[in-house]
Amino acid sequence: SDGTQSRTVAWTVFDTGPRKAKNVILFVGDGLSPAHRVAARLLSKGIAEGKSLGKLAIDDMPHMALVATAGSDSIITDSANSASAYATGHKTAANAMGVYADRTANPFDDPRVEPLASLAKRRHGMGIGIVTNTEIEDATPAAVVAHTRRRAAYDEIVAQFFAARPDVLM
């Protein structure tokens, strides 16, 4: 072509669909209340005239929530059933994780609840990562994958990590 010809083309432009999350990070400050954050801020940044002299990195997180928890058998929670509620969206009894607790002798035969991380992996191919500053079999990190009525069953909980195969475990 010599560049003298022109053509008109009609394009139909469609809006893109809603963005889907690539990753979800749930940061759990086990036992971390607003009072603990205030104390950390005052001790690390200093105080003048009743006000903190700086902010913590957590203060700039774009999304944050405070959750009041209660177990299925008590208004007082422990790390196991509160972390299980975060991980599954279902309440359970004290010392239980990922189950509807019953009264049978076997703490591993209770009806199971699928953790949200497992659902995200199964349905959307997302990865599961668990990073903790305590032992992985401790109640808060274990609630991401464990199914038991007995939070102190550490050997069995570790075996459940091998079965769940999280992509990151530190």
PLM segments and residue spans:
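N-terminal catalytic scaffold of extracellular/periplasmic and nuclease hydrolases
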Residues: 2-170
